A protein has these predicted regions:
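Active-site-adjacent substrate/metal-binding segments within catalytic domains
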Residues: 203-368, 382-410, 474, 480-481, ...
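Substrate-binding cleft of secreted/luminal carbohydrate-active enzymes
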Residues: 410-414, 418-420, 586-639, 650
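Short carbohydrate-recognition loop motifs
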Residues: 40-60
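Glycoside hydrolase catalytic-domain groove-lining segments
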Residues: 489, 493-585, 600-607
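Polysaccharide-binding and catalytic clefts of secreted carbohydrate-active enzymes
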Residues: 270, 280, 294-334, 409-532
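Active-site clefts of carbohydrate-active enzymes
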Residues: 321-328, 383-387, 474-488, 520-522, ...
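Extracellular ligand-binding interfaces
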Residues: 53-145, 169
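Aromatic-rich peripheral "rim/lid" segments of glycoside hydrolase catalytic domains that contact
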Residues: 432-444, 618-666
Length: 666
């Protein structure tokens, strides 16, 4: 076999693309005052053109500011222009100050150039901004916040990472520019901004493709979509459940199950066909925003006085929540819009090659039993598990499952139980028990210690404590340095008890349904040494272990060494800022074209991962300009505020769904 090596060349030049007057060219500062460190890159030339050749698979370059930190706070984006000279595409990821959340990414096609946009996050908002724009995560003027660990006025470094680069590939990275001026509104400028949401739920002060100005345009968009779905009703190689009808047929049980087939984990549908779960969450809802106390943000809805506002407005807990999405469906379909929404949601998903209605979706859509779905049970208090040793924990689970219509429904794939629990480190649960959060668990902890230690004096020696009686131990809430091993042991015992109880409850009340796990939070838990302990425990009880994984790829998600179990992505997304919303989501995608491209690659990577049996995008709708209850106002939907598709993402989903079974079976 002949091997061809393509060289990687990274070149920084001082020529820049056309930049606005308020943009800042960062490259001259880099070359004059900053420092550059590389990993897996070899410098081959000097001067103002910086040129490296990759010497290994996976490489990166880090640019540091020097003695004085950079001030990125006047800008919204850091933009790097990347030219790929190789004969295959190149993945590029940018990080600001090494922060997990502040990233930008893109796939640069072979022999092409692409601009990689990185969103400059704000660590916190001023008191004035919080008062002027309450309960909004993204604000007018370019302010977006997540859990970033840096301050934009003091940036010390940023990196460009090439995790899939091969030794010898060539790339030119040129023109580093800070773009789009950042602005904070106050005084007259703030007053002039108001109202900033129009009668259709769109941001007033921006122009973008697809923005409407009248009801007629909503109707026109609906007709266009109907014709599109007529042209593409769905994948003809799928069976009624979305399984691979043209593929092998395994044992049919009448329900979904999981099986390892030819070295890869698969779901198997009720008819025995291989099934890979290509899904979307929150189908049929998820755009409500509280208008009470913020009335000045919104233009009048311009509706007749006779309109029944309860069709799109709900009032609860001192909140008045308006769904512009429902209002706009009312405008095009009338009072019976819900019936048409349910029908269209089912036809849409099939047309988009989506075969799973994922978490938190509308029960009325699910009950049509036209597309497989996942069910969800919540036992948690915030991010805390319930006390797994409480008698009510198991009883409550069984009552909830028994009352669920999904328990015996062949269209239900399985149950997620809880979401993004706070597991902490491997002593966390025992520490909470010791401190009194879990009284039943604390009693069990005491009894295990009584069995382990010959006497309380022996425990005191190990822990460095001075308990006179076990009653004293029960009253104590202090954590002693010598207790670490016992805390580790009991944390494991508690976690086992939690997952075991859920598994047994599902087996008792929904024996044919899969236990899909607890949707581990955000990062790459598998492979993370700090958190691997809890993933391995979950895998003993879950039929499929789930991760809400907001990264740019799912390919590297693997069980720990010597483990083998199926996994599923419960949430991921890539957001944009080019369609009138004010926040780019938990993973920024930039333009609609780029976020669609990121979607396509993410799902294809997951399809090729032998352990993954599905990906579920969060979420069906774009969120509201002024945000949901916790302030999320992300442009992350498959559809926009007036119920029209975000076409770039639709095309990406169709493309992936058209070939996913053939790709996975290779």
């Amino acid at each position: 076999m002949k091997t061809f090596l393509l060289s990687i060349v990274i070149v920084f030049t001082c020529s820049v693309w056309a930049v606005g007057q308020n943009n800042r060219k960062l490259l001259p500062e880099l070359l004059k005052e900053g420092s550059i460190d590389t990993y897996g890159l070899e410098k081959v030339s000097g001067g103002k053109t910086l040129h490296w050749t990759a010497t290994r698979q996976g490489a990166s370059v880090t640019f540091s500011s020097g003695e004085t930190a950079w001030d990125f706070s006047p800008f919204v984006h850091l933009v790097c222009e990347v030219q790929n000279l190789a004969d295959h595409e190149l993945f590029v990821e940018c990080h600001l100050d090494g922060d997990y959340w502040s990233t930008g990414a893109g796939y640069v096609p072979a022999r092409s150039t692409k601009k990689i946009e990185t969103l400059i996050l704000r660590k916190e908002y001023s008191k004035q901004q919080l008062e002027l724009f309450p309960k909004m995560n993204g604000l007018p003027g370019g302010a977006t916040r997540l859990w970033c660990g840096y301050r934009p006025e003091s940036i010390h470094r940023f990196s460009l990472d090439f995790p899939r680069i091969q030794s010898g590939d060539e790339v030119v990275v040129k023109n580093v520019v800070l773009t789009i001026p950042y602005k904070e509104y106050s005084g007259k400028e703030y007053e002039d901004l108001l109202p900033f949401v129009d009668e259709f739920g769109q941001y007033v002060h921006s122009r973008y493709p697809g923005k409407i100005s009248g009801v007629g345009e909503i109707v026109k968009a609906d007709k266009r979509e109907e014709q599109d779905m007529k042209n593409y009703p769905g994948n003809k190689s799928w069976d009624i459940y979305g399984g691979w009808a043209k593929g092998p047929q395994l044992a049919a049980t009448g329900h979904f199950r999981v099986e390892k087939y030819q070295g890869k984990w698969w779901l198997v549908d009720p008819q025995g066909y291989l099934f890979w779960s290509h899904g979307i969450t929150c189908v049929g809802g998820g755009d409500e925003t509280n208008v009470k106390g913020r009335e000045k943000f919104y233009r009048p809805l311009n509706l007749p006085a006779s309109v029944d506002s309860s069709l799109f407005v709900s009032e609860r807990n001192d909140r008045k929540e308006l769904s512009y999405w429902k209002l706009n469906m009312y405008r095009k379909w009338g009072a019976d819009y819900k019936t048409k929404m349910i029908d269209k949601a089912n036809r849409r998903l099939k047309s988009w090659n989506i075969n799973t209605i994922a978490n938190w979706s509308n029960e009325e859509v699910i009950r049509t039993r036209k597309i497989p779905y996942t069910a969800v049970i919540h036992t948690q208090y915030g991010h805390f598990i319930q006390d797994p040793f409480s008698p009510e924990f198991r009883k409550g689970l069984e009552r909830t499952i028994a009352g669920s219509s999904a328990a015996n429904d062949e269209w239900c794939i399985g149950y997620f139980v809880d979401n993004e629990l706070g597991w902490g480190n491997n002593t966390y649960l025992a520490t909470l028990a010791l401190q009194g959060r879990y009284p039943y668990a604390k009693e069990v902890f005491k009894n295990r210690l009584i069995e382990k230690y010959a006497s309380l004096a022996e425990l005191n020696t190990i822990w460095g404590s001075e308990f006179a009686t076990w009653e004293d131990w029960m009253k104590n809430d202090s954590v002693y340095a010598g207790a670490t091993n016992d805390l580790i042991d009991f944390t494991s015992h508690m976690a086992n008890a939690y997952f075991r109880s859920v598994k047994e409850a599902l087996k008792a009340k929904a024996p044919h349904k899969l236990y899909l796990g607890c949707r581990f939070n955000y990062g790459d838990f598998a492979g993370n040494a700090v958190q691997q302990w809890i993933v391995d425990i979950a895998a003993k009880y879950c039929d499929v272990v789930s991760f809400n994984r907001y990264t740019y790829s799912a390919y590297s998600l693997r069980p720990s060494k010597d483990r083998d179990f199926p996994m599923i992505i419960g949430e991921f997304h890539f957001g944009g800022l080019d369609r009138g919303l004010l926040h780019g989501g938990l993973r920024y995608g930039g333009s609609q074209e780029n976020r669609a491209d990121l979607y396509k690659h993410y799902v294809q990577d997951a399809v090729m991962n032998p352990y993954l049996v599905g990906t579920h995008w969060f979420q069906y709708n774009d969120q509201a300009v002024t945000g949901r209850g916790d302030g999320e106002n992300y442009q992350i939907g498959f559809i926009n505020v007036y119920d029209a598709p975000n076409w770039e993402l639709i095309r990406a989903a169709r493309s992936v769904g058209e070939t996913m079974y053939e790709l996975r079976s290779k």
